[in-house]
Amino acid sequence: MYDVIIIGAGPSGVMTAYELIQKNKDKKILLIEQGHSIKKRFCPREKSGKCINCKPVCNITAGFSGAGAFSDGKLNSYHLSNTGTPGEIYLGGNDGGYYRKYYDENTIKDVISYTDQIYLDFGAEPHLEGLEYENEIRALQSKAHESGLNLVTFPIRHIGTEKTHELFTKIENYLLQYIDIKFDTKVSDLIITDGLCKGVEVVSTYDEAKKEIISAKHIVLAVGREGANWLFKKCTEHNIVSNPGAIDIGIRYELPDDVMKDVNKYLYEAKFIARVAPFKDKVRTFCQNPSGFVSTEVYDNAIVLANGHSYKNKKSNNTNLAILVSHNFRTPFDKPIEYGRNVAFNLNQLGNGKLVVQRFGDLLNGKRTWDYELENNSVEPTLKDAVAGDISFALGYRTLTDIINTIKAIDKVVPGFANHDNLMYGPEIKFYSNVVEINQDFETNIKNLYCIGDGGGLTTGLIMASASGVQMARILSNK
């Protein structure tokens, strides 16, 4: 029997394992991951130039280090953030609900700082972007405020996609000295009896007929966004208490570096938050990649979504970023993950299984984009196999209205942001909308079953997911 089983080798699961080792090397720990070892994680697009829909899982979204860590590698120093409100720090897309509920700000800062140092110890970039231009940043924040936007700033430690691979290879090698790791292994079920979780049922991702029961004293759900839909199903099957949270639906936006040069120089990533008329939904920019590349990722072997990469050595002439709208559903419909999957499925149909790309001006003028128009467009697409089309067929009036009005508002701060040749790729959706109810120890209503990271709706992003893993380990080390 294991002391701890961790389901998922993304940032939260990896950091749980790492910190448990620091606290007690004698604990018997098993880390289960449906994807590959990081040594086998390579996207074929790098050589072929197109997505081949890897089976049994996508190499971008699954495998050691998870989806967010493998795609770009930005560590947001939220403990040093500036929201414009004295004494308040920003804690990501869901504003750190768990942390704000249970911990004071100094404790939050300490755990983020500690987590950041772990990454530094394994070779993360020591330089922090966004610390050198205080006056210029304040001027941008002032312009944003005049346009009805909030510009949140925080230093960023940019590792880069290729360097992230090297860093997590070191972490994987370290963990293998002390714990067991099962790669290419799915957790098909949780073993729960009389309100107590006693273990897991696992199968090979290549042969689901071979089942194995593994017992443990404590089971940690660290399934990430890739596992959010799986976790929602398990919550339903086993009466694990959870509630629908917000789902973020939007697009990946691509525009020239020249337009973003000041923002890229001063901040590296600008986090604009808007509540534009008429709906006043929360809209935010996310995951900005200067001189980056638009990319695809496949979730649940079923839906193709947009993302973005930025490398330390390989550069384009474009900046890309996500523009995401937070939607909440209650009565009578309360299945945000299902809604998001349907949006993605419909847009994927329009793109024949690929992302759809449309010029911003064409969307405003009520027309689709054609291939020949992209060939002569001033903004050259960095994602070559996206299909020219019309995203308005699938994204929905409310979502598109929020996105369009946010782009126009940002254009007042960053002239050229609403240029008609800028490109919109769809869909980009973040699946962390099933919020699992937990206590301060991350424990669910099922005894000895814990939930951390993005998959359970607790966090959004690499650093906060990692910090939840550190905190989880500290709690378990005393049990």
Predicted features and spans:
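Residues forming the flavin
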Residues: 1-88, 133-479
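Dinucleotide-binding Rossmann-like beta1-alpha1 core, especially the glycine-rich loop
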Residues: 62-129
